[in-house]
Swiss-Prot record:
GO biological process: cytolysis; killing of cells of another organism; programmed cell death
Leader peptide range in chain numbering: none
Lineage per the UniProt record: Bacteria, Bacillati, Bacillota, Bacilli, Bacillales
The entry's keywords: Cell membrane, Cytolysis, Membrane, Transmembrane, Transmembrane helix
Protein name: Antiholin-like protein LrgA
Subcellular location: Cell membrane
Membrane topology note: Multi-pass membrane protein
Record organism: Staphylococcus epidermidis (strain ATCC 35984 / DSM 28319 / BCRC 17069 / CCUG 31568 / BM 3577 / RP62A)
Length: 152
């Protein structure tokens, strides 16, 4: 049974790969580059500072949800970028090292900020997930098991 399920998953994966291979890697990279270019233009007109990469992610999400961009148009390049994300953080790490004199001025404040922001992120994520589960947008397994036992 497990082997059949794994074979089914592999077959579905190859079907998905064939859909995304309909577009060349160049076309996929160009699609992502155009979205990033649009986000750079939007960034220049925004009254508040917001990174173009964040704007680009939101634009890509909206484009995927509305069907303007199909998943196959960005899937292969997106997967490659995600698989190599550690390599993409090297420039950011070098920037931090170049900013060490600034960071040395108030290390306790920076550590405190990191701890507080992490705790706030955990709390907000917990509340958001609880809200989603209680509103039945994403029902938990426990609720599914309870409802299946009631009827049978």
């Amino acid at each position: 049974m497990v082997i059949l399920e794994q074979t089914h998953l592999v077959k579905n994966k190859t079907v998905d790969n064939k859909k995304s291979m309909k577009y060349s890697i160049f076309q996929q990279a160009l699609t992502i580059a155009v979205i990033l270019l649009i986000s750079k233009i939007i960034e220049s007109f925004m009254p508040i500072p917001m990174p173009a990469s964040v704007i680009g992610l939101v634009l890509l999400f909206i484009a995927l949800c509305t069907g303007i961009v199909k998943l196959g148009q960005v899937e292969t390049v997106g997967t490659a970028l995600t698989n190599n994300i550690g390599f993409l953080f090297v420039p950011a790490g070098i920037s931090v090292i170049n900013s060490l004199p600034i960071l040395k001025q108030s290390p306790i404040l920076i550590i405190l900020l990191i701890i507080i922001s992490t705790l706030l992120l955990l709390i907000c994520t917990g509340f958001a997930s609880q809200l989603l589960v209680t509103k039945s947008l994403f029902p938990s397994k426990e609720k599914n098991e309870e409802t299946s036992h009631v009827g049978g």
